[in-house]
């Protein structure tokens, strides 16, 4: 039988106030006074003792009832608060009136209840408690012979019961005002930092985007070295901007915790891949130790845990010049069977932390001294971000000295034991058919290491509309999109977007969120109204330097198809466009499309492979491309069957997403559409229909394979290639 204590703790830990603590103390004090009076009158009997006992028992029973009510309805209840206050004062006043001198210590209880209500619930409750307590004590003075016989003491205590809480009320209001002003100042600082981070992203967008375009051109060794330096500097600046945004989110309490199953050792391995080269460059010994009793499969926020480790271990590498850096993971004793508490220790032999710095170690924008801030780059936010993330995940963090030199940063986190992870098939991306060396760039084989050429091979050309009020941002997007094979029209405002869409159809729109006049959100809302009136649906991608959770949520609610952060990352942009191409492909009916056979109409969109053939890659390449894509599609169908058998609906959606991407590469419209439907289905729908959907997918894939075989045979015979019409 499990103990009810963990359930009680979970039930009460998330409450918005501390009413349960006040009620628990009431129960304890009532019990203590029952014991006190029993000891005081152990040899005395009488009606007053019986009345006192009945009052105390009644208060105890009502208090227990209030505790049950709190457990059943943990929400804030003003009615329960008032009932508790009335219970305290009426019972205290009645006992003081009945018992007289032996009950005089209850005056302290009256004062405690009054001050406690003020501290817990605010000034209004403090004044109400003062009035209730004064009236109850006044009743005891007027009834009890003891208090009547000591008028100076009685009236003096009554004045104290009024004056002390009222004076305390003035102090409480001053403290509340000071806290509110400090909070407003902190919020203003956070807004300023977030705004500055937003402004940094705009020039970074031009810098990062243009260097990605430049990296795809022919460069000699010296130019490549210069370009790598520029890109590394841009990434470093972006990481500083991200740290400022992280600390702003932590201070605003907007950190979202996303708990998922993950492999602890794989996650630590990904951290090692990033930090080991840095440690090797500084000639440091770098190692990790995970205790044997630490489970590998856990459920927790792996992204934030990884960020904490990168901050702490990265700091250890940065501040260590000789010796070693060691990450240890151990299991804290006393962990439950279905949960575990892990301790992470990051040990180094670096410069350590000076004594005068330790109290401020986890404060924002702090480094050990000015000399260090010049010597070691950074904002001084790493430990602050780590502390905020660890506490948001329900853990604790600290520091201790590592003798004879260095430091040890540690943190503990509670985690649930994860479900066994299925071994997933490693899918080779369709684009990775050829790892072409430089000498093959001039041949008729696509260099698939180039993301733009890979995108052009996978995604048909689309008509894009781009809106941004900064000319540099428009130029970056235009260069990136044109290099990826798309046709682009750039405008500088949201009004021009609506005008352009009223005149012509576009496959997708990329719009900045914040622009003068009509902003991106207003444009999205207006566009949805126009589309509801009969205009063709066009997906909209929001590209913005404002990456706050509120901005992202507002864009989703307004109908944005995707949200991308500035500075634009070419790989993410191209992946998003590939996803959009699936939803818009069925609307495209180019006049140059050559149908393979009328029996395959609706099964195969020949324009996709026609565009690939138009790149001049050769017939052999197209056959290899089709063969690899079909193999990938068969693997995806097998994954869907495995996921359905295991009732892993989330992974089934991921497998359907992969199938949709592969099918869209081939122009298999039916398969891509069915994959998209599976992605959007709820768990209960998948549970009921996945076998039927899988059977349909297999039939559609077989029909698509027949259509592709016919096309490939036609290409071989010279019947279907666009070049045959030249």
From Swiss-Prot:
Entry GO MF terms: ATP binding; phosphorelay sensor kinase activity
Null mutant phenotype: Deletion of the gene results in overproduction of DSF.
Modified residues (Phosphohistidine): 198, 657
Recorded topology in the membrane: Multi-pass membrane protein
Control of this protein's activity: Binding of DSF to the sensor region causes allosteric change, which facilitates RpfC autophosphorylation.
Reported modifications of this chain: Autophosphorylated. Activation may require a sequential transfer of a phosphate group from a His in the primary transmitter domain, to an Asp in the receiver domain and to a His in the secondary transmitter domain.
GO cellular component: plasma membrane
EC category name: transferase
UniProt xrefs under PROSITE patterns: HIS_KIN, HPT, RESPONSE_REGULATORY
Modified residues annotated as 4-aspartylphosphate in this record: 512
Cited Pfam families: HATPase_c, HisKA, Hpt, Response_reg
Subcellular location, record wording: Cell inner membrane
Domain HPt stretches: 618-711
Residues annotated as transmembrane: 23-40, 52-72, 95-115, 128-148, 152-172
Cytoplasm found in the keyword field: no
Keyword Nucleotide-binding among record annotations: yes
Residues annotated as domain Histidine kinase: 195-417
Keywords: ATP-binding, Cell inner membrane, Cell membrane, Kinase, Membrane, Nucleotide-binding, Phosphoprotein, Transcription, Transcription regulation, Transferase, Transmembrane, Transmembrane helix, Two-component regulatory system, Virulence
Stretches assigned to the Response regulatory domain: 463-581
Reactions that this protein is recorded to catalyse: ATP + protein L-histidine = ADP + protein N-phospho-L-histidine
Listed EC numbers: 2.7.13.3
Function: Hybrid sensor kinase that regulates diverse biological functions through two distinct molecular mechanisms. At low cell density, the extracellular concentration of the diffusible signaling factor (DSF) is below a threshold, and unphosphorylated RpfC is involved in the negative regulation of DSF synthesis, via direct interaction with the DSF synthase RpfF. Interaction prevents synthesis of DSF, which remains at a basal level. This activity does not involve the phosphorelay mechanism and is not dependent on RpfG.
PANTHER family for this protein: HYBRID SIGNAL TRANSDUCTION HISTIDINE KINASE J (PTHR45339:SF1)
Domain notes per entry: The N-terminal input region plays an essential role in DSF perception. DSF binds with high affinity to a 22-amino acid sensor region at the N-terminus. The response regulatory domain, but not the HPt domain, is required for repression of DSF biosynthesis.
Subunit structure: At low DSF concentrations, interacts with RpfF.
Name by which UniProt lists this protein: Sensory/regulatory protein RpfC
UniProt source species: Xanthomonas campestris pv. campestris (strain ATCC 33913 / DSM 3586 / NCPPB 528 / LMG 568 / P 25)
């Amino acid at each position: 039988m499990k103990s009810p204590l963990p359930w009680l703790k979970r039930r009460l830990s998330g409450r918005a106030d501390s009413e349960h603590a006040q009620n628990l103390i009431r129960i304890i004090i009532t019990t203590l006074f029952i014991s006190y009076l029993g000891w005081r009158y152990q040899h005395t009997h009488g009606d007053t003792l019986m009345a006192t006992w009945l009052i105390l028992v009644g208060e105890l029973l009502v208090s227990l009832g209030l505790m049950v009510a709190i457990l059943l309805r943990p929400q804030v209840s003003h009615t329960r608060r008032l009932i508790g206050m009335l219970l305290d004062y009426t019972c205290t006043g009645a006992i003081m009136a009945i018992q007289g001198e032996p009950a005089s210590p209850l005056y302290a209880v009256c004062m405690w209840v009054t001050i406690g209500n003020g501290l817990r619930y605010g000034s209004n409750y403090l004044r109400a408690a003062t009035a209730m307590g004064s009236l109850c004590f006044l009743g005891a003075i007027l009834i009890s012979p003891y208090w009547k016989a000591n008028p100076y003491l009685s009236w003096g205590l009554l004045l104290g019961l009024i004056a002390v809480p009222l004076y305390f009320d003035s102090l409480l209001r001053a403290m509340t005002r000071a806290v509110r002003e400090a909070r407003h100042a902190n919020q203003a600082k956070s807004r300023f930092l977030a705004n500055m981070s937003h402004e940094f992203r705009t020039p970074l967008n031009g810098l990062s985007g243009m260097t990605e375009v430049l990296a795809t051109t022919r460069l000699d060794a010296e130019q490549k070295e210069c370009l790598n330096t520029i890109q590394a500097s841009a990434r470093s600046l972006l990481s500083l901007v991200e740290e400022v945004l992280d600390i702003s989110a932590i201070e605003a309490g907007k950190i979202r915790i996303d708990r998922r199953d993950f492999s602890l050792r794989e996650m630590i391995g990904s951290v090692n891949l990033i930090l080991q080269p840095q440690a090797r460059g500084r000639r440091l010994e770098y190692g990790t130790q995970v205790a044997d009793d630490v489970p590998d499969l856990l459920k927790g926020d792996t992204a934030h845990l990884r960020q904490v480790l990168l901050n702490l271990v990265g700091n250890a590498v940065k501040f260590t010049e000789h010796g070693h850096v060691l990450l240890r993971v151990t299991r804290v004793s006393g962990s439950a069977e279905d949960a575990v508490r892990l301790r992470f220790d990051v040990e180094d032999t670096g410069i350590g932390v000076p004594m005068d710095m330790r109290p401020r170690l986890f404060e924002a924008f702090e480094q050990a001294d000015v000399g260090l801030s010049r010597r070691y780059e950074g904002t001084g936010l790493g430990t602050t971000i780590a502390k905020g993330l660890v506490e948001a995940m329900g853990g604790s963090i600290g520091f201790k000295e590592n003798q004879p030199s260095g430091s040890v940063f540690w943190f503990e986190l509670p985690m649930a034991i994860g479900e066994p992870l299925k071994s997933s098939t490693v899918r080779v991306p369709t684009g990775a058919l050829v790892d072409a060396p430089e000498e093959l760039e001039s041949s008729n084989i696509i260099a698939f290491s180039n993301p733009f050429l890979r995108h052009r091979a996978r995604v048909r050309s689309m008509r894009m509309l781009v809106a941004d009020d900064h000319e540099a941002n428009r130029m970056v997007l235009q260069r990136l999109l044109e290099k990826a094979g798309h046709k682009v029209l750039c405008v500088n405002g949201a009004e021009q977007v609506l005008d352009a869409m009223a005149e012509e159809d576009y496959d997708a729109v990329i719009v900045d969120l914040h622009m003068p006049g009509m902003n991106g959100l207003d444009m999205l809302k207006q566009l949805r109204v126009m589309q509801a009136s009969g205009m063709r649906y066009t997906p909209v991608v929001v590209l913005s330097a404002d990456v706050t959770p509120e901005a992202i949520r507002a864009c989703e609610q307004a109908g944005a198809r995707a949200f991308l952060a500035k500075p634009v990352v070419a790989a993410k942009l191209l992946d998003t466009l590939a996803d959009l191409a699936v939803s818009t492909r069925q609307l495209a009916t180019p006049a140059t499309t050559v149908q393979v056979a009328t029996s395959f109409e609706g099964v195969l969109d020949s324009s996709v492979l026609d565009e690939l053939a138009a790149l001049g890659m050769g017939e052999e390449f197209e056959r290899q491309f089709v063969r690899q894509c079909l193999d990938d599609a068969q693997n995806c169908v097998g994954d869907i069957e495995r996921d359905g058998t295991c009732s892993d609906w989330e992974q089934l959606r991921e497998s359907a997403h992969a199938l949709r991407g592969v099918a869209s590469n081939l122009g298999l419209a039916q398969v891509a559409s069915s994959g998209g439907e599976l992605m959007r289905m709820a768990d209960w729908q998948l549970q009921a229909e996945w076998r039927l959907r899988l059977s349909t997918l297999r039939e559609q894939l077989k029909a698509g394979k027949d259509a592709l075989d016919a096309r490939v045979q036609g290409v071989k015979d010279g019947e279907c290639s666009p070049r045959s019409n030249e």
